[in-house]
Amino acid sequence: MSLLTEVETYVLSIVPSGPLKAEIAQRLEDVFAGKNTDLEALMEWLKTRPILSPLTKGILGFVFTLTVPSERGLQRRRFVQNALNGNGDPNNMDRAVKLYRKLKREITFHGAKEVALSYSTGALASCMGLIYNRMGTVTTEVAFGLVCATCERIADSQHRSHRQMVTTTNPLIRHENRMVLASTTAKAMEQMAGSSEQAAEAMEVASQARQMVQAMRTIGTHPSSSAGLKDDLLENLQAYQKRMGVQMQRFK
């Protein structure tokens, strides 16, 4: 895996799924391929994106700044600085300085990532902030190692909370989760259906699932009742996937 592919993989792992993720993936690919050289416009676009957390925006802004060539005097952006200040915690700043000194001695992406992984997310973000604010310099490769370590830390905690939701024994949460997944899968099927012969069938399956979820939410049902909806939709989906040759989000 090339360095930029690895960076793209880690950065996208912390972006919530949805149309925005596809858009961000496209921007990253363009930036890494040298096709997008207007850093100012890119940062303005990033700043106004909904859904993303300030830290995710900060990390993306840092990656864009590292990658897109720009004039030396170009102003640093406040939204990136605020996101990479380690929540203003002086402990994070102290640790960030220690980490920065260690990173100065590293020359490879993997070496930097390894060193950075032993620090907390707050310290890692603060260290990125130091580099972003030009208070310190490291090679681009080392900076990317720091980015990927930070994304791995964030993705780990997201995975833990996702796993907690999936394994929760609270039937109300499981029920709602199944209905949300049914809705998003239906939406994805409708979007994909546009260009296939099975479009009518896909739209029909998706529409039924939507109506069912809507009815359940309106009337209120027993938490176990969505299990049947999930099984039906899953069955239809799998048959549809086989014909389409695609793999879609799995249900829990």
Swiss-Prot record:
<dbReference type="GO" id="GO:0016020">
    <property type="term" value="C:membrane"/>
</dbReference>
<feature type="short sequence motif" description="Nuclear localization signal">
    <location>
        <begin position="101"/>
        <end position="105"/>
    </location>
</feature>
<dbReference type="GO" id="GO:0042025">
    <property type="term" value="C:host cell nucleus"/>
</dbReference>
<dbReference type="GO" id="GO:0055036">
    <property type="term" value="C:virion membrane"/>
</dbReference>
<feature type="region of interest" description="Membrane-binding">
    <location>
        <begin position="1"/>
        <end position="164"/>
    </location>
</feature>
<comment type="function">
    <text>Determines the virion's shape: spherical or filamentous. Clinical isolates of influenza are characterized by the presence of significant proportion of filamentous virions, whereas after multiple passage on eggs or cell culture, virions have only spherical morphology. Filamentous virions are thought to be important to infect neighboring cells, and spherical virions more suited to spread through aerosol between hosts organisms.</text>
</comment>
<keyword id="KW-1048">Host nucleus</keyword>
<dbReference type="InterPro" id="IPR013188">
    <property type="entry name" value="Flu_matrix_M1_C"/>
</dbReference>
<protein>
    <recommendedName>
        <fullName>Matrix protein 1</fullName>
    </recommendedName>
</protein>
<dbReference type="InterPro" id="IPR036039">
    <property type="entry name" value="Flu_matrix_M1"/>
</dbReference>
<keyword id="KW-0694">RNA-binding</keyword>
<dbReference type="InterPro" id="IPR015799">
    <property type="entry name" value="Flu_matrix_M1_N_sub2"/>
</dbReference>
<dbReference type="GO" id="GO:0003723">
    <property type="term" value="F:RNA binding"/>
</dbReference>
<dbReference type="GO" id="GO:0046761">
    <property type="term" value="P:viral budding from plasma membrane"/>
</dbReference>
<dbReference type="Pfam" id="PF08289">
    <property type="entry name" value="Flu_M1_C"/>
</dbReference>
<comment type="similarity">
    <text>Belongs to the influenza viruses Matrix protein M1 family.</text>
</comment>
<comment type="function">
    <text>Plays critical roles in virus replication, from virus entry and uncoating to assembly and budding of the virus particle. M1 binding to ribonucleocapsids (RNPs) in nucleus seems to inhibit viral transcription. Interaction of viral NEP with M1-RNP is thought to promote nuclear export of the complex, which is targeted to the virion assembly site at the apical plasma membrane in polarized epithelial cells. Interactions with NA and HA may bring M1, a non-raft-associated protein, into lipid rafts. Forms a continuous shell on the inner side of the lipid bilayer in virion, where it binds the RNP.</text>
</comment>
<dbReference type="InterPro" id="IPR001561">
    <property type="entry name" value="Flu_matrix_M1_N"/>
</dbReference>
<keyword id="KW-0472">Membrane</keyword>
<feature type="region of interest" description="RNP-binding">
    <location>
        <begin position="165"/>
        <end position="252"/>
    </location>
</feature>
<dbReference type="InterPro" id="IPR037533">
    <property type="entry name" value="INFV_M1"/>
</dbReference>
<keyword id="KW-0468">Viral matrix protein</keyword>
<comment type="subunit">
    <text>Homodimer and homomultimer. Interacts with NEP. Binds ribonucleocapsid by both interacting with genomic RNA and NP protein. May interact with HA and NA. Cannot bind NP without genomic RNA.</text>
</comment>
<keyword id="KW-0946">Virion</keyword>
<dbReference type="InterPro" id="IPR015423">
    <property type="entry name" value="Flu_matrix_M1_N_sub1"/>
</dbReference>
<dbReference type="Pfam" id="PF00598">
    <property type="entry name" value="Flu_M1"/>
</dbReference>
<dbReference type="GO" id="GO:0039660">
    <property type="term" value="F:structural constituent of virion"/>
</dbReference>
